[in-house]
């Protein structure tokens, strides 16, 4: 990777070895923040490994040192923090921070972890190294898919909502809502990679996917709703690379990545030998699955030829009798991370929020500058540009951008007018980042 190497092999191994779980009340603390920065470095290095070089040491290190279960636990812990503690913080009348960057880092932590898992779960040995926590990860992905199915609208805020006057905490809540959509889409990809490993999953995991959550039927609903597609001004748009992009008329029939992930997951869940002997084809399941026939066009089959087997399966399904729900007595494992964390912290959400208000999120200007300096060192511009899938976009209007903020060098704009309009939102972070750079 030459000059684009972010971490030396020895340095990456030290960071991986140091990964560990934190209690909910510790989120945002100094030690937690350091691990978050380390995770971001591992994240960027993993993307570089996957796109620039042949070797993929981050994935290998995570497997070797048994850290995939740690990442899964951290993922579910921050998900719980966002559901149980973050809303309490937002309601506290005596908490009106002028700078929400420390809280943003906790909110963003879930996105960082799921992004890393999406990058490395492509490899079967990573899924296998998750051990029992793959059950917890399946449940996590199921929760995110439910959010996608229930989602209404186009998946982001309107321009009026995005730029209307709001307090820093209200602004952070909007950002968290927009982030949740992207997190859920990445969870879909992780779930698809788990289904690639049907032959090595435990019976408990197979039962969780096929019976408890009935993922095949849920995926059919996802295809019907297609929350990553919308019509805007009469034009078709797909959500890709973190934003809505207009699809050229000549590309309308082209399969997008997220639809592809759903189809591959369906193929694995319905046609793998492990699934075919365990999935109970009830009247409801049959009715849902036969809806897929309308989507299996010749154009789609040209792009994913293996779906011809799924088409044959559905043609056969239409002719056979359905099965009554199975009532077998099965002794199986159940996910334990969410339940354990909830038991440990039940009735303490208010206390955790107040503790974090006093000891974690009320930082001095000096502490904020130091944090901004570490942030600037973590997000190296040359690496970010190397892993970016396309040219940068304007932070205000999302048009293609060619000019950076001259002060912090981290935010892009298409013109001076957009920069002026965005300054009210960007100003405080910009000043802190610039001060951090000068303090190096």
Swiss-Prot record:
SUPFAM superfamilies: HIT/MYND zinc finger-like (SSF144232). The keyword Repeat does not apply. It holds the Pfam family zf-MYND. A zinc finger (MYND-type) spans 394-430. Keywords: Cell membrane, Cytoplasm, Cytoskeleton, Membrane, Metal-binding, Zinc, Zinc-finger. GO terms for molecular function: molecular adaptor activity; protein folding chaperone; zinc ion binding. GO terms for biological process: cilium movement; inner dynein arm assembly; motile cilium assembly; outer dynein arm assembly; positive regulation of motile cilium assembly; protein folding; protein localization to cilium. It comes from the Eukaryota. Zn(2+) 1 binds at residues 394, 397, 414, 418. Belongs to the ZMYND10 family. Plays a role in axonemal structure organization and motility. Involved in axonemal pre-assembly of inner and outer dynein arms (IDA and ODA, respectively) for proper axoneme building for cilia motility. May act by indirectly regulating transcription of dynein proteins. Interacts (via C-terminus) with DNAAF11 (via CS domain); this interaction stabilizes DNAAF11 at the protein level. Interacts (via C-terminus) with DNAL1; this interaction stabilizes DNAL1 at the protein level. Interacts with DNAAF4, HSPA8, IQUB, RUVBL2 and DYNTL5. This is Zinc finger MYND domain-containing protein 10. It comes from Rattus norvegicus (Rat).
